[in-house]
Amino acid sequence: MVKAVVFDMDDTIFYPQLPFERALKAICPLYAGDVAETYHLFRRVSDKEFECVLRGECDTLTFQKIRFKKTMEQCAYEAVTDEQAADFQRCYLKEQEKIEMLAGIKETFDYLMAHNIKIGLLTNGPTQHQWKKIEYLKLREYIEEDHILVSQETGFAKPDKEIFDLMAARLGLTADDLLYVGDNCQTDILGGLQSGWRTIWINHKQEDVSAFGEFSTAFVIASHEELLATIEQLIP
């Protein structure tokens, strides 16, 4: 029986692409590449480079500059300076103050609360940065502070089993009681499944599900609008 539902944040509760797009246009107005593809590359680079922060090899500000510079380098854009990378980060943060929950998320939270199901948040990223997003999204109205876990606080990151185990301990539950909702098949879904959790994969990027045989036990939906109906099947 599901006793708690834990959510990823970026691209699951809200779309960070719009703040990214606005900041990119402000700092690199001549950039002509596909913004969606650039954003997804930015996320992949960010996930990889953040490992340096977890290992204590660089600080958050350095990481934020490096991820943007490497993203634009891989897009064959002109060399980005440290100053431009810092300007992008400032603009990106400012735009993030406007973020809102996606359609279907609030309704899902309301449903879970009405059925006395615990709600948790498990997110990768720098502690201060992720907590600002939590504040902008007003997630504390739905999620207790003790049920929120940001990877930098722990020294682990999804898909590490250790961070899922820490989340389970925070909730006072076992893996059999837990359901994880996320958009990233590697960090969210594989991490959850390998930790013994049930999972819902919001595959809004329309990735080829057949390419991921190990995810056959995950619930897969194509959009956030399908989330509540799927939750209702699991928690009637």
Model-flagged regions — what are they?
Residues M1-V5, G33, K106, D110, ...:
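Asp-based, Mg2+/Mn2+-dependent phosphohydrolase catalytic module
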Residues V2-A103, A114:
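N-terminal helical cap/lid subdomain that shapes the substrate entry/recognition surface
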Residues T108, H115-N116:
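A structural motif corresponding to the C-terminal end of an alpha-helix
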